[in-house]
Amino acid sequence: MSHSVKIYDTCIGCTQCVRACPTDVLEMIPWGGCKAKQIASAPRTEDCVGCKRCESACPTDFLSVRVYLWHETTRSMGLAY
């Protein structure tokens, strides 16, 4: 099952989510929109196991990284039974 990983622009570039991910789904990429000049990116969402460790590691008040499990994604799209 494929999960959706969304990175929000509230990312502060701390790398905590990248280090917490056991399957290397996340990586940091250059971005001038925050103090750290980098932001998390999720180029390998097909490897996401849905553990949400990245969410737990995020230090921002509004989670900058969110994992939507496949059943949550289909429900929000009106595709679940």
UniProtKB/Swiss-Prot annotation:
It is found in: Plastid, Chloroplast thylakoid membrane. It catalyses: reduced [plastocyanin] + hnu + oxidized [2Fe-2S]-[ferredoxin] = oxidized [plastocyanin] + reduced [2Fe-2S]-[ferredoxin]. Disulfide bonds: none annotated. [4Fe-4S] cluster 1 binds at residues 11, 14, 17, 58. It is a peripheral membrane protein. GO terms for biological process: photosynthetic electron transport in photosystem I. Its EC number is 1.97.1.12. Its cofactor is [4Fe-4S] cluster. GO terms for cellular component: chloroplast thylakoid membrane; photosystem I. Keywords: 4Fe-4S, Chloroplast, Electron transport, Iron, Iron-sulfur, Membrane, Metal-binding, Oxidoreductase, Photosynthesis, Photosystem I, Plastid, Repeat, Thylakoid, Transport. Residues 2-31, 39-68 form the 4Fe-4S ferredoxin-type domain. Apoprotein for the two 4Fe-4S centers FA and FB of photosystem I (PSI); essential for photochemical activity. FB is the terminal electron acceptor of PSI, donating electrons to ferredoxin. The C-terminus interacts with PsaA/B/D and helps assemble the protein into the PSI complex. Required for binding of PsaD and PsaE to PSI. PSI is a plastocyanin-ferredoxin oxidoreductase, converting photonic excitation into a charge separation, which transfers an electron from the donor P700 chlorophyll pair to the spectroscopically characterized acceptors A0, A1, FX, FA and FB in turn. HAMAP family: PSI_PsaC (MF_01303). PANTHER family: PHOTOSYSTEM I IRON-SULFUR CENTER, PHOTOSYSTEM I IRON-SULFUR CENTER-RELATED. NCBIfam families: PS_I_psaC. This is Photosystem I iron-sulfur center. It comes from Pisum sativum.
